[in-house]
């Protein structure tokens, strides 16, 4: 290895080290900027605390409405099932009546 290639390699090492350090600093700065932006966009803790109560009440009301909807859906399914049974019962009754009529007709 001659002196020029040694100097070139050393120069590359210095450039790579400086470049890596600059990238690291830039990454730290970007992360800090991102965290600051997130904090600014979420509002102050006062605004969060002020809305927390109404959000909690809204969640409770939503859960109550979900429970009511589930009960109503259960009743609707039960009603539909009973209507289906009645429909089948009526169809069976009609078949029985039709069969009795066919059996009672005298063939000439």
From Swiss-Prot:
One of its GO terms (cellular component) is pilus. Induction: Expression enhanced by contact with host cell wall. Also regulated by HrpRS and HrpL. It is found in: Secreted; Fimbrium. Keywords: Fimbrium, Secreted, Virulence. Residues 41-72 are annotated as: Disordered. Signal peptide: none annotated. Changing residue 4 to I: In strain: KZ2W. Residues 41-56 have a biased composition (Polar residues). It comes from the Bacteria. Belongs to the HrpA type 1 family. Major structural protein of the hrp pilus, which is a component of the type III secretion system (T3SS, Hrp secretion system) required for effector protein delivery, parasitism, and pathogenicity. The hrp pilus functions as a conduit for protein delivery into the host cell. Also, affects the expression of T3SS-associated genes. Required for full expression of genes that encode regulatory, secretion, and effector proteins of the T3SS. HrpA-mediated gene regulation apparently is through effect on the mRNA level of hrpR and hrpS. This is Hrp pili protein HrpA. It comes from Pseudomonas savastanoi pv. phaseolicola.
């Amino acid at each position: 290895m001659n002196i020029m290639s040694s100097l070139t390699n050393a120069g590359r090492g210095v450039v790579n080290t400086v470049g890596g350090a600059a990238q690291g600093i830039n990454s730290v700065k970007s992360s800090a900027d991102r965290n600051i932006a997130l904090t600014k966009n979420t509002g102050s803790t006062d605004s969060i605390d002020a809305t927390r109560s109404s959000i909690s009440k809204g969640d409770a009301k939503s859960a109550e409405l979900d429970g009511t909807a589930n009960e109503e859906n259960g009743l609707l399914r039960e009603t539909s099932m009973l209507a289906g049974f009645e429909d089948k019962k009526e169809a069976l009754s009609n078949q029985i009546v039709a069969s009795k009529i066919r059996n009672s007709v005298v063939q000439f």
